[in-house]
Structure formats: structure tokens, C-alpha cells
Amino acid sequence: MQHDKPRQNGLAAHAPPSGGASDLRERIVDTSLMLAEEKGSWSAVRLHDVADRLSVPTAEILDHYRDLDAVADAWFLRGLKAMVGPKPAEFLDYAEWRRIEICLVAWFDTLAEHRQVSAQMLRGKLHLSHPHHWAPMVFNLSRTIQWLREAAQLPAVYGTRRASREEVGLTALFLSVLLLWMRDETVGQERTKRFLRRELTPLT
């Protein structure tokens, strides 16, 4: 006779399909997002609930993520990987502004499924009572812009005056588009994409 594994708090019945240990990190992220959508708030997610949903010990979550903020960082890393992912064969034939647009749209499209939760993550990182998050966020933003330049294959050499100007401009662009995207309710993020195209048009 086969015995079902005991459920914890009735949550395990709704766990995402399980895989091997190698994909537990990804399942932790996915389950955290799912719980945030159910609760209506990222800050309401508790890692012990994530462990219950995945039917793993809470200590196993700690093996992969030090806290919920680290889970958020892993979610944003998916956007970064999409940004630097495969490009069309003719990518280098495009103007620089178009390459930048393709890369940024890839980032936003990847995170769009959980846009509201993503916005909550970002607001949490900016919370005035959490100054220990500020410096890492600044460095993460800088890293994102560096990878944007890499992904768009901008030719200016790192450390040159031109590269520095590009970084300042791309940082301002990214933040302005991000603020709009966080509250964009349009289908396919069309409002965000139109705004991005308008902002990039002067570069043509």
C-alpha cells in the first residue's frame, strides 16, 4: 500500500512540479513568486512557507538563499540573463539605439509575468528603514548597466570618457523606463515600450 507524504499546513498539495536538487534554487524562486501572488505582497512571503510548499526543510532554503532579498536578486538575475541571451543573427547590423532597445525589452519582458511583485521587491529595497540594502542595490544597478553595454555590444572601451557618458545616460534611461514599467497596466507593456522607443529616438 502506497502512503502519501504528509502535507505541511496543507501547502504541499500546491507545490510546483519537483525536479532534481540542481533546480531547487529555481523552484525556490518560482514558489516564492507564486506565494507573493497569492498573498498579494512580496513582503508577506515567509521562507518557511516556501519550504512547506516545496516539502523541504527550511534549512535547505538557507543552503541556497540567505534571505528573501537574495531570492529577489535571483529573480532579477533572470532578467539580466535574458538581456545578455541569444540575439538575432543580424543584431550587429542594427544601430546602437536599436540594440539597446532589444536588450532592455528582453529584461522587462522576462519579468513581466510578475511585474507587480517585481515592483514590490524594488520598493522594499528602497525602504528607508533598510539602509543595508542601498549599497548592494547601487552596485546591482551598476552591474546591470555594465551588462547592458556588453549585451548591446557598445564599442566604447570601459573606463574611457565615452563609456562613462554612456553609463550615465543608460542609467538615467533604465531608471526612467523602470519607474514607468512598475505601474504599466497596458497589454504587452506597450506604454513602456513606446516610452523607451521615444527616449531612444534622439540617438538615431
Segments predicted by a language model, with ranges:
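N-terminal positioning helix adjacent to the helix-turn-helix/winged-helix DNA-binding module
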Residues: G20, L24-T31
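Amphipathic alpha-helical interaction segments
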Residues: D49, I102, A106, Q120, ...
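Hydrophobic alpha-helical connector segments
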Residues: A74, P88-Q120, H127, V138-N140
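Helix-turn-helix
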Residues: Q2, R27, L35-A74
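Amphipathic alpha-helical packing segments from all-alpha helical-bundle domains
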Residues: H130-A156, S164-S176, R194
